[in-house]
Amino acid sequence: MSSKSSSTIRDKWKLKKWYVITAPKVFGEALLGSTPAYDINKALSRKIEVTLYDLTGDYNLVYIHLYFKILGNISGDKLSTIFYGHELSRDYIRSLVRRKSSKINAVVDVTTKDGYMLRVKGLVLTTYRAHISQKTAIRKVISDITRKKAEESDFDQFVQDVIFGKLSNDIFQEAKKIYPLRKVEIEKTKLLKAPKV
């Protein structure tokens, strides 16, 4: 009985086809990996996790985790993906926190000019401990700049600005006028809704 079931498993594996998974154009259509499936439809909506280091070869970016969702077939055995979100590693965030300073978070839902909805979590770390009014003002800066950037950008441009530090730099330049800052990061993003094609 067991030999029959094991041969059935082997036969099922033989029937599966391997598909190559590629990143979106904004990440240079880099190879993300491969996945087996009987049918291409079985592979759709699977989520892939890589680090930015995996895509760029820059070890300094190993703490940035990227998430992609398989969209469909490009040609033959090649599958396309959409950026689904990112997150900074907990160890990296922990390494940034200092005593006698403030950690300020703001979560904001935004829509890009081409209709993609995302949830963005900004993180600001001050040099010294900030007052409540200063924290409130900094949260407003995070929200306002993030919304404005999204409204002015298409999805690919906004993702690029988030991942490669343009958005966090814009927030830093404005928020430092309120209180001395040590670091600004976009801690996490998640794609909430994509426009129907």
From Swiss-Prot:
- Could you tell me which InterPro entries the record lists for this protein? Ribosomal_eS1 (IPR001593), Ribosomal_eS1_arc (IPR030838)
Which cysteine pairs make disulfide bonds?
none
Q: Please cite one Gene Ontology biological process associated with this protein.
A: translation
Magnesium: is it a keyword of this entry? Answer: no
Instruction: Supply the Pfam families for this chain.
Output: Ribosomal_S3Ae
UniProt superkingdom: Archaea
One cellular component term from this protein's GO annotations in UniProt: ribosome
Q: Which GO terms describe its molecular function?
A: structural constituent of ribosome
Keyword list (alphabetical) reads: Ribonucleoprotein, Ribosomal protein
Q: Does the keyword Ribonucleoprotein apply?
A: yes
* PANTHER family to which the protein is assigned, alphabetical: 40S RIBOSOMAL PROTEIN S3A (PTHR11830)
Family the entry assigns = Belongs to the eukaryotic ribosomal protein eS1 family.
Task: Return the protein name.
Answer: Small ribosomal subunit protein eS1
The protein's gene is named: rps3ae
